[in-house]
């Protein structure tokens, strides 16, 4: 085991008293974006204008070189399809663009009961945002001296941590913005997460291929597991009970570590056919989702003992055209979102494993995604230096979604085991599919791990690095 990391903690003040925004986040004026704002979003001009954008159904990043229709003479009106660019006219999702970082935005979160946003960037900053007007509320002081690869926040939104390529993990008080402590390691840190109860911090190592679990209260080391994987860690996270740590790696392996017994509970080898980029638990802790450079996502049962040797999974395919960088479950696990290097955010129907909608607009890799607790908003962070806040509360009323449901013949059922509502294809003849949701089907079937994903023993060398890789 490595010796405990050096640190310099200061006073702790965990109570957060940030007031909620007074204006509704859903206010917007479609079609009222100024040409100056659009020009800034396009990056073609350097204008001294605010870095905020009104929530609108128009996508300034998808515009052609011509100004919007209301600024053109009548004979030069731009067709509607040019205004929408990559967006399908039947999937008009209201959104807001948040600009303020000077480099790729690597990580994003909702916090303070969805009234604030948190971001970290390769510009070495960690910022707190007001989602109503898109302004930066705070730049956290004593910032890292190298790119920020990931940040995390406690469940009560009192403390923030960030991992950086300067080999440090730093913690701040969210309300005051003051640095609480800094821990320096001997290797690069590529991932960091608070436990849901705020007691622990887990960090993932690059060169050492391991993880470190630290007591966040006393700033002492609980466990250091070197060579936990055979290649660099890409992501790690706690389960909702703060008792298990999941980690994924370039070695295509998934591992579950028990904090109390300090032992590996579960190992799934060759879980994907390429490097695994990210992982996240459902809020029950029963299932784990992994995203990969193989363009797929998988949902694994990591709770019941009978799956300890081989795992059990459902594969989500054909959602991205390139490597998948990130994934995040809704609080009730009714849907899942993922971000990809194809510049899109995919919204998945978990019950039936199909892509419900694809959100387009970013002009570079989507590096991280998040879902608000009320399930009305999606936040995406991109290498294009922006974040996007998407309003999805009326997603089931979108013409494109309705059109797809009619085409495939979806209908709503209730799971006989857990009473969870789920959708099914009318054409499916399997009786089990008509009675149980996807999670209960994994439990009852005891599906073996998907062997098709482990057929390849080599990884694509030209694949882009996952979120948290220092090669970018």
Curated annotation (Swiss-Prot):
It comes from Homo sapiens. Residues 458-472 have a biased composition (Basic and acidic residues). Pfam families: WD40. It comes from the Eukaryota. Keywords: Repeat, WD repeat. WD repeats lie at residues 100-139, 143-182, 184-224, 228-267, 271-310, 319-358, 361-400. Gene3D superfamilies: YVTN repeat-like/Quinoprotein amine dehydrogenase. The keyword Repeat applies. Changing residue 166 to H: In a breast cancer sample; somatic mutation. The gene is WDR88. Residues 1-22, 447-472 are annotated as: Disordered. The keyword Repeat applies. PROSITE patterns: WD_REPEATS_1, WD_REPEATS_2, WD_REPEATS_REGION. This is WD repeat-containing protein 88. The lineage of its organism: Eukaryota, Metazoa, Chordata, Craniata, Vertebrata. Disulfide bonds: none annotated. InterPro entries: G-protein_beta_WD-40_rep, PQQ_b-propeller_rpt, Quinoprotein_ADH-like_sf, WD40/YVTN_repeat-like_dom_sf, WD40_repeat_CS, WD40_rpt.
